[in-house]
Amino acid sequence: MQHSPSTTTDHIHFAARFFDRNSYTMDRRLRRPRRTEDVSSGPLLAQSKQPSLLPVTRRTGSVTAAGATATATATAGPATRTRASPSRNKVVAPPSPDLGPRTRRSSRPRSSVGPLTGSGSGSSLPIKAAIKARTPIPEVSEVSSPIRLSTSNLPMTLTTNTSSGAPNKAFNTSSVNSGNSFSRTTTSSTTTTTERIEIRAEGDGEVDTDSIRKRITERLRRSVSKTISNLAGTPVTNTEEGSRYSRSVSRSVYDDEKSSKRSYSTGEEDIDEEDELEEDQFRSFNVTRKSATPAEISCRQLKAPREFGGWLGAFLFLLLLPTAVYYLTWSCTARNACQFKHLNLGILLDVNYLTRQVFQPRVVGAFAAYQVVVFLLVALLPGRRVHLTRETYKFNCLAVSLTLLIASGVAEYLKYPVVTFVLRHYLRFCIFGLVGAFVAAAWSYWLVDTAKYNVLRQTLTNDYGRTGSFVVDFALGRQLNPKWLGRVDWKQFQYRLSLVTTLIYATCYIYQTLVWPQKPQLGEQEGYLYQAKYYWNNVNYDPATLFSASCLLFYVLDAIIFEHHLSSSFELQHEGYGCLLLLRYAATPYLLTAVTKYFYEQRVPISCWYAPLAVAALLSLGLLVKRFSCAYKYKYRLNSQSPIFANIETIHTYQGSRLLLSGMWGWVRQPNYLGDIVALLALAAPMALRPAWPPVLGLSLIILLLLHRATRANARNQARYHSSWQRYSTQVRSYILPRVY
């Protein structure tokens, strides 16, 4: 058919405009993100009724199809538009299974345009489906034969629920009287997979059912263990004797499979599994229970820390410490004789001697009354309160000491021989104190409530006294700060009892060595100045005893006045309330007063006048070092934001605390112990006038105790702060004395 020129020109203009519009639409679609639903938006991109065989994806296919259509239109030029016949592009589609509704996985919203439908015009959009057909399960042909079927439930779980992670409730297995051939049928779903194993055999012979069940169980165990081990990332070898499977598989948040089931689990446990978790809270991720490696077991079990060499070392300390203290004290009881003596152990079995000479009822009653009075004063008198993170402490040792000194002075003024009574029964009081330490430790071990809480409601138990060994726990104490009715700290009571006892002994020796003259007859012109001068010129005293007792008094008053510095010490915060601590508190007064007692009984003269000055200077130096270091640490623990700590050097720890590197704490690790040791050496220095071993060994025991405590504190800090303490140790290498210890 022929067309006029005008008609042809109109067709050409129409085709050009149509091509430009389609090109503009294609450019817009190429510039913006494509969605799957955009395939049906253009009139030229309608899907054909027959599927295309072009192997392209959705987005690529959309662009390709659009480009192909535009090219075909441009090639046609001014020719007349024709519609392609559907029969030319018809391709017989291969048989495909019914896939059902496709699950939408895109997070984008659905398009408002309807599904793709064939319009019968234009080229079709080739789309390749990415869904694979399910692989059919091969079936094994069965041989008809007489069958005896026996069903047994194997006690194990093969798979887990994929939606909830919970295990299957049952696992059924049917076994037949043969082990030669078997058919395995697997039924799977979206959530649970259950295996059913059937073994069919020919013949009517008897078959060992237990043997078949055992072989099936072993094979399934190996397959399940291999599957779960591959999922976990670590191969696990299981044996029949060393493997038993749990009812659910827990997923750990750790990669090393050393996390417990409590760490993370997506399963829904039943009642039986909850009982198992209560019995064993730390189980490996591994599906087996008994196939854990020794390395995993060692990581699970936390060994109790050991001090003093275990139970044997603790037993030797409990036996030798009170014996040594009593022997050294007993060796210097007689006048003009302070030397080692032979022990008569048979006296310990003589009940009459112990009753008449040692445990006299009047002396025992006085000692018990003294302890009760000190306890009441500690509980009732006000004191300085120090608020720390874990506990609030009250320190009133100074008030207790002043009260007892005033009461003793009044009693002495009223002609009650308090000083004479105290010094006469010095050795008996030493025995009573050592025995009382064992009694108090036993009472604390058996009767004190171990569930007392501090201000943060945390138990104050001693980890080093929870070993399970009676000797170790009794020696080190199961608690840190037990309290009576939540008010009186037993450790502080024993500490103050030790300080007050030492103070009383020092004042008694000073009072006893001073021989006051009779009261002068004052005239009308003489006043108080004349009276003071009279006593100064006529008083009699022993210089060595007075000097030694004065040094001891100065040493004890320093500890009493600055008692609140104890709140940041190792002794109050970390030392357990055990028998060893109580023995030290009971023995300290008699070890410290051994030198003063020696000078009081031996009457040793001072041969050189500058000796007291050297001793006083050494004592002042030691107390200054001790007090400065303790005060520095106390103020920092109490308020680390103080301006005096603005530019100090510290090491941060993972526990939130800091290790001091400034002041004396950056010079040695325990400067307070260094000052205490120097002060003790000053107390023992007067023994150079007339040496004697028992008093010197008594003070040496306290020095050895401080050295041992420094070692214990270093070990505990190493176990607590780890790498932070390692860095601190590299900078501060010495414990007490630089380049020596």
Swiss-Prot record:
Task: List where the protein spans the membrane.
Answer: 308-328, 363-383, 402-422, 429-449, 497-517, 543-563, 577-599, 604-624, 687-707
GO MF terms listed in the record are: chromatin binding; DNA binding; lamin binding
Query: Membrane topology type, per the record?
Result: Multi-pass membrane protein
Keywords of the record? DNA-binding, Membrane, Nucleus, Phosphoprotein, Receptor, Transmembrane, Transmembrane helix
Q: Where is the composition biased (Polar residues)?
A: 160-184, 231-240
PTM-bearing positions, type Phosphoserine: S111, S144, S223, S225, S243, S246, S248, S250, S263, S284, S291, S298, S640, S642
Name used for this protein in its record: Lamin-B receptor
